[in-house]
Amino acid sequence: MANIREIQSRINSVRDTMKITNAMYMISSSKMTQAKKKLTDTEPYFYALQGEISRILRHIPKLEHYFFDQRETTPAEERKIASIVVTADKGLAGAYNHNIVKLEEEILSRPGIHKLFIVGELGRHYFAKRGVEIDTNFQYTVQKPTMHRARDIAGVLLDQFMSGDLDEIYIVYTRMENSVQSEAEILKLLPLERSSFNEMKMPLNVYREAIDLYPSAEAVMDSIVPNYVTGMIYGCLVEAYASEHNARMMAMRAATDSAKDLIRDLSILYNRARQAAITQEITEVCSGAKAQQN
């Protein structure tokens, strides 16, 4: 009977765990839906900014601006490279955090002076233990990404880029391809690449509408680019947040399915043990009855 009680205790424990994993699945499902709606609502504005930058470059192909300065004269070993690394604040999300960390370690293996700006507690703890230089004043959570937070992050990075403290800025995040697949990705924020704005190409003999830029093209770029970078960061934060909860949903679904399988196996063991115990009791009763008859 002790064995039966032990099996029953394990079944109850697994059932309690299954309730937790199922609840976490439902919570992550709700948060992922909210994040995807945020991204859908704000994407048109930032696509419009990208279109305006492309339009300006189309009309002024030789426009010189420090946001496009590749700083080619700086040797690779002396280039100051910043990475915004977007991880989760907690685990239980499958390989989500591992994939981000692995991708950032590839950047750290490149020549240059590296500096990390970590969004998310797990990434902050991971790289701090390995002695990588981290901006300790950069304390941002990944939970419920907002435009205000993205603007603060962009402000910190833009100031350091314009002052010459940084030569390149990347963001490492997880892009959600569909409801079942996400992929860790590196996106270059600064300096801007002209080629990335050349998608809307026009033949040379096609009339190009005249545009007036006041007070100057440089001043217009000074206004548009920071908003564009802010939008890119916000989009990455929201997409990473959705990807995190998508990964957690899949992990919790797998855990729930495993719990169901374990409960089924334990139930079979429980029934066998109970049947054996009943058989043993019947055998003992029959043996006792025969002993009394003799």
What are these regions (language model features)?
Residues M1-N294:
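C-terminal beta-strand-loop-alpha-helix "lid" module of Rossmann-like NAD(P)-dependent dehydrogenases
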